[in-house]
Amino acid sequence: MELWAWGANNYGQLGNGQPCEQVERPLVVGTSPGTLDLNSESKVIPGGGHTLLLTDGRLYAAGWNTKGQCGLGSDQDHVPQFVKVNIPTAFVKVSAGWDFTIGIDKDGVAYGCGSNAFGQLGLESSLKVVKEFREIDMPLKVSSVACGMRHSIFKCDENDKICVCGNGKKGQLCNPEGPLKENTYKPVIVKFDKKICEVKAGQNFTMLEFHDKTKKLFGDTKHMVFSDIEEKLSIDDVIQTEVGWTHVASLHQNGLVQAAGRSDYGQINGVADLKDITKISIGYEHGLALDKSFDLFSWGWNEHGNCGLGHTENVFQPMKVTLEAGRKVINCFAGSGHSFALANNRL
């Protein structure tokens, strides 16, 4: 198993040990057997300028660390190579915001590190920076979390409830009374009249997916008409929905992809031409898609080479990303301005 990476690397967020402005074509940053213990279930969680790797409950971190978002307990501004994080317990879910990270264990306990300037970690307001993972005092047990730029949404074990914290000035905390003027430092419960199966967070918006397949969006409407998107996504054949900074995309049972929202960098252009897709990953303003032949495609914002095509022009039509000959891509992960793929040999 190999981990490939490309795109922005000014903080070392690709984890290859050699920080540079950008990497325009995929390169190998880890193998298994090796120090990262990669397997087909390993997950890469890219944040704003940092990256987490979760594999069998163990957590590794690389990149931007000025707010302690790598969870290493150090004053190191950036971490150029993946380093194992000393976490309180094995994590089963991890989400990365712009400059913070939250992990959840098998018992539904949440832990956070990084910036808490807006309450996004759910910790007391006196804690602005947290350099090691600290337990969050949650009112309920939680099963997953989605982190935006400055807010966090937790799916609770009680399936009709979420817990929210952070900045809610755009309405992204799903408050039924509308946007909040003050930051929410202590996680609060928001209850709905039906069961929630997934939570997603964009820059300043939140998307909830319910068990009846319907979707509900909250927050900044500048680049999206929420009612139109909710209608398009609330159908039975949607098998995966992902959100970017200011757009959303959905994968359907027939292998086709739809997208809506901001498109000035090509975020949603041309995705209708993708066929036989089995997985999508949506970054802040670019996207990745994997097809049934294990080929990888990219599109959208490409200022840092994050589309992996050998240049930095924005990509308005999905293009095939080429790894070394003979490689089969089995998963893909898009971040802010960086991208990752898990691959193995086709033989």
Task: List where the protein language model places each region.
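Eukaryote-biased RCC1-like beta-propeller repeat architecture
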Residues: 1-347
